[in-house]
């Protein structure tokens, strides 16, 4: 039952909203507009019925006159179901005549004179209540003369109802104009898309051709005919009716879920926003009419054939007895006449009465409430009324579709059982087997629904969002960004040693999330949009901090071959530029020399392999990935072992500047602060040359020559240390001076050099 207290509460809110000033440009919904919508709804359907009957009747008569053996019987009983609803309630006499036609009874064809009044149309409907015997129902359907008489009677009462509705519509428009002198005229074209009775086009298909009376009127053919009628209705609802209703339902849903509920959102999300309340009531009335047609068709087919669907032989011929019994029980609860008070149809009737419910005023006169357009009222009407309508309609159509599928399977696989067979025992055994199978499949489907559809990917910055939150979807990290972060993480870990030996790395999502949550003050400044000071105005300490923050965001290093192509800084002196070019040329010469004579220990252990990347998942839960890349200078192989929590599909190679030289530190690789700027090379502060290395001919007074001498000494020393480490030589006391001069280095100098290297 519908909650009466909730309806009264909504009615009180609607009455209270009458004192609220209306939104400028909106049109309130009152009793006059509700009556106009009711009259137009009936006129749309009756005019379409009259038009299609004028097309169908001459066509059938022409076929019958040309060929007497060509016998087509119109299925008027199903055409009457298309007219189900409150459209004939405009007159009690017409409503009674319509009910008699649905019982295959003839009526008087005299015109009904209705007293002119502008009352609300009663939404109470009538739905084929009796369970007529199957033989009587079948004989009436195949009775050609009876069907033609009922068809003519239906055309007469439809024309009579059209006259009454037109008179009522003219009168209510006059009353509305007199009551609302300056109000906008009610343009019914704004609700025409919702009121268009597209289901009436089924009238042209509701006829049966009889060639062989014995075969075409058999029980099997009769069941097939009814199944085809339901199939046409089901197809019409899904292809023509649902798209129109779904479009406006989605628009209302989008507006009701948008926060805040403002007038701008109302104007943006809803078509004809000034008439939103009129369209909501029209939508409600349209869904009620469609549901009346669906239930009337279903009752007219299910109730006469009820014993056939409950028969033991029919149940044994079904694919799954347990599933079939569940569907039949739900159909009986929905379509049985004694269950009218609990059906969705009754709830819709009560909800429609809410709009026309009258209230008593202070002077003891009755009036209907006036609904002023407010965003909050639209949201409340959607949440309390409309959001419950469409799910019920979908569930009913889903139930009917399942019933039709079972019925089709039964008719194709109907079995003939001997009388000697124990049908009840067979049914009991089949029911137990099918129940176990049905529950097993249902549990499997429920597990699949609960299983997340998105696998958890390892990300060094943020965990993957939950796939089950569809109401408020979060921004998910793309696969390319995850791979890029994984490459940066691997490159930073593997670049700590210049060796070519395999590197074993383990991803840890928790550590990555912890690191992400820590934001440095400098980075917070960058986030807030404040530009750091110019590099020429910063001290050495500030430059180191800024370059460290920038290098952590962009750890990629340009290859040596591209260093010469970079544009120099305009603030850098020409001597420093020349110094850099000399160092780069020397390094390139050494790299070519080392590439021509590769290390035998490394080359012997490496087999030629194509440039591929693969991931092998082992049974222990760990995945090993080997990536091989062949560059112009070196060949590097990295074998990575991932823990079970990580799933990485692409790894990266360690990148270094050249052989024997460790990668740039964070302070050496600053990132430009603006898009399009190139990176200014950091000023290198080399350790002073030891006193024992200061040879008199190489001492220069120029500042830049001294800096070049320190730089050359440092690079020569690092190259020598790298070569000694690769060849396994240690403890050598000779030191390589710039330009190939060998000197002896004391123990104190070696200790000081180690301390300085650690402090760096």
Swiss-Prot record:
* Species this protein is from: Saccharomyces cerevisiae (strain ATCC 204508 / S288c) (Baker's yeast)
Does the entry feature the keyword Cytoplasm, yes or no? yes
Gene Ontology CC entries for this record: cytoplasm
Locate the compositionally biased regions of type Polar residues. 534-554
- Region feature (Disordered): 449-573, 593-626
Q: What is its main location?
A: cytoplasm
Entry function: GLC7 phosphatase-regulatory protein involved in GLC7 subcellular redistribution and chromosome segregation.
Residue stretches of biased makeup (Low complexity): 454-474, 494-506, 561-573, 594-626
Q: What keywords are annotated for this sequence in UniProt?
A: Cytoplasm, Phosphoprotein
Organism domain of life: Eukaryota
| The protein's assembly and partners | Interacts with GLC7.
Q: What else is known?
A: Present with 227 molecules/cell in log phase SD medium.
Q: What is this protein called?
A: GLC7-interacting protein 4
Per the record, the similarity remark reads: Belongs to the GIP4 family.
Localisation per UniProt entry: Cytoplasm
Ranges of biased composition (kind: Basic and acidic residues):
512-525
Q: Name one GO molecular function term.
A: protein phosphatase 1 binding
Single Gene Ontology BP annotation? chromosome segregation
Q: Which residues carry this modification: Phosphoserine?
A: 497, 501, 609
